From Swiss-Prot:
GTP 2 binds at residues 187-194, 234-238, 299-302. Associates with the 50S ribosomal subunit. PANTHER family: GTPASE DER. The gene is der. InterPro entries: AAA+_ATPase (IPR003593), G_ENGA (IPR031166), GTP-bd (IPR006073), GTPase_Der (IPR016484), KH_dom-like (IPR032859), KH_dom-like_a/b (IPR015946), P-loop_NTPase (IPR027417), Small_GTP-bd (IPR005225). Keywords: GTP-binding, Nucleotide-binding, Repeat, Ribosome biogenesis. GTPase that plays an essential role in the late steps of ribosome biogenesis. GO terms for biological process: ribosome biogenesis. The lineage of its organism: Bacteria, Pseudomonadati, Pseudomonadota, Betaproteobacteria, Burkholderiales. This is GTPase Der. Belongs to the TRAFAC class TrmE-Era-EngA-EngB-Septin-like GTPase superfamily. EngA (Der) GTPase family.
Amino acid sequence: MKPVIALVGRPNVGKSTLFNRMTRSRDALVADLPGLTRDRHYGEGRIGERPFIAIDTGGFEPVVKEGIVAEMAKQTKQAVVEADVVIFIVDGRLGLAPQDRAIADYLRKTGRRIMLAVNKAEGMKYTSVAADFYELGMGDPYAISAAHGDGVRELVDEAIELAVQERPELAEEASDEGKGVKIAIVGRPNVGKSTLVNTLIGEERVIAFDMPGTTRDAIYVEFERGGKPYTLIDTAGLRRRGKVFEAIEKFSVVKTLQSIADANVVILLLDAQQDISDQDAHIAGFIVESGRALVVGVNKWDGLDGHTRDRIKHDLERKLQFLSFANFHFVSARERTGIGALMRSVDDAYAAAMVKLPTPQLTRVLQEAVEFQQPKRVGASRPKLRYAHQGGSNPPIIVIHGNALSGVAETYRRYLENRFRAAFKLKGTPLRIEFRTNKNPYADSKD
């Protein structure tokens, strides 16, 4: 599991700048809850070999009781609930503000591990930067510059250390708990995840998940279907931890991200009776970014007329075209229709994700693809694609060697991906293609 770090502070202290710097390795935004323009954002980052999840929040004014600012405060409180460590950011140039005191008072009551970061501290002496903020009672401040990166690595390193002290299991590798294929069922609230879980495991079990505990402790449920073992990773909802925040929503982005990372195959469940939302697309995007095998289930399909079904299929093709590699199934978890085909696709997706691709066959498919359609010239030279081999599994990675490969266009990369998919019948898994210009047996050959 990955430590979760929430960034909290009043408006315009540099939270988003710090968030973008922390998560730059993963393109920053991986999930964005709908609603306000200043809802909380989630991203993944990495310091060395240590991954983490960061949450960016809107400007926090905890004493405001109504309006958009109050809604932003609610989002921030939710982020604090989900976090292992909270980084409280203040502005070193403007000094201590009354809002900072109010935020500090609130954070002290949460029981979370809090780190105080004084941003915009570039060019300032530490003693002068820190002096204003000791009275907040948050310990020694960390002087940073989110814009320039000064002090950020040390800050995040320490945040991860504090998180591991709080929850030692965060230092462990992805869980090997359970038997067979590990499945995560994800989706926004009320799409029928719990009903599908009960249908798969054959008993009213999900209610047992909703017990007091931490917000992110995974629960593994083993079951068999057709004589095959599987392990289901619980994503049934967010549990309350203490009395930090009473009105906790049932959908937890952090819980979803953690379960996707731990799964072999993800079932993305959609609601046929609701339009595809930005939230659906964000969850789907993270699954693809994570490289997880995927099956899409469109639930509540029973009772819909032919015209409605055609419209839904058209919307799926239009809004989720980047999931064309996945199998879509139209099911009813309540009526238990379509579940067998859904699970067969789970097996197929897992097999595709773990496939072994021999180098001679990969190279032959590559050469046939180039012979059929060469990459476009870049300036005076044309990229030369020489040979291919497998660089990893789950998802499959195909490494292509050659010359001048930095000039290969994205459209040509997609063309090659489609050729490899068709040749090896890779359905249900993302496929990564990497281009590598290096010394190889063909490097000095003549065309």
